[in-house]
Each structure stands twice: as C-alpha cells, then as structure tokens.
Regions:
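Loop/turn elements at helix/coil->beta-strand transitions in domains of secreted/extracellular proteins
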Residues: 10-13, 44-46, 84-88
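Extracytoplasmic/periplasmic substrate-recognition and gating elements
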Residues: 55-71, 79-89, 157-173
Length: 173
C-alpha cells in the first residue's frame, strides 16, 4: 500500500524509441531540462517529467538485433499504445519505421490521418528533427559518460541531434 500511495506519478511522459537505450546521464539531464517547460498536471504539487525507453529496431533485415530485447521492447511499446497510455511525446530514432509499424503519430498541424489503420501517411509531416527546435537544441544537457548501457562518452546534445520528435495522435471514433 505504501508504494502505491507514495509512488511518484509523472506529469509528462516522453517515450524514447530506438535501437539502444539512451545513456543514463542524458535521460536525467533531459528530464531535468524539460521540467521548467511543464506544469503540474496531476495536482500533486510537483512537476515530474519521465523519459521511458523502448528498445525497438524497426529494420527487420538487421541481423544484429537481439530477439529478446526486440520482443520486450515491442511488447512494452504495444501495451503503451494500445492501453490508452499516458505518453504523447515521442523521441524517435526511426520515425519512418515507428509510423509504419504503429500509425500512432499526428501531423505537425495537430490533425490525424483519416484512418489510423492506414500506415502510408507521410511521416515527414509528422515529426521534426531535434535540431529544428531552438528550445530543444538550446537545452543545457551536458555530457554523458560510459556506463552499463553506453560504451563511449560525448555531448548529450550531439547524441540527440540525430533524433526526431513526434506527437501521438488522438482519434475519435
């Protein structure tokens, strides 16, 4: 009961979907840097941004993909998308593959494809590059160091500059 009562519930959830996890330093810096741009949506008196990681490789021809990690990532992502999950912001390594497999994104103008089951929507009109947003590109995210997930170190901004931002669509029946 204690864990349920005192559990921190995020106000904003961001889903990172890529072939490998982001470095812990980058995730922490991103959560901290986004917090001032968010509000206390759940009314608990705190603003909490949470970045959830989904390790998924949408390239079926990639033979170096670990089947167990792939299955776990796909299962978790599918559960989040199908259960009416709380994630609406996506940080994507492969936006084309993500949209083709999930059909979950809305267009940049806020409209959604006519049929969410149709995955031939133009994904380029549904995302923007991290570097195309001055606010995101200007965040002070510092550097990441090697850890259990990442073998190298470098600039978190440089790492994120290769990703795209997309927003989950909301369809009405």
């Amino acid at each position: 009961i204690k864990d349920t009562v005192f559990q921190t519930r995020p106000d904003v959830q961001v889903a990172y979907v890529g072939t490998s996890d982001l470095p812990t330093d980058t995730v922490t810096a991103l959560q901290d840097a986004l917090t001032p741009f968010c509000s206390d949506l759940n009314g608990d008196g705190r603003v909490v941004v949470q970045v959830d990681s989904y390790t998924v490789d949408f390239d079926a021809a990639n033979e170096s993909t670990d089947a167990y990690y792939q299955m776990a990532g796909v299962t978790r992502l599918s559960a989040e998308l199908s259960s009416g999950g709380k994630t609406y912001i996506f940080l994507l390594e492969d936006p084309e593959g993500f949209e083709a497999q999930t059909g979950a994104l809305q267009y940049l103008d806020g409209t959604v494809p006519d049929d969410p089951e149709t995955t031939d929507a133009d994904w380029r009109e549904m995302v923007y590059r991290w570097t195309d947003c001055p606010v995101l590109a200007g965040l002070d995210l510092g550097d990441y160091t090697s850890d259990a997930v990442q073998n190298d170190s470098g600039s978190s901004q440089e790492l994120l500059s290769h990703y795209y931002i997309g927003i989950r669509g909301a369809w009405t029946k």
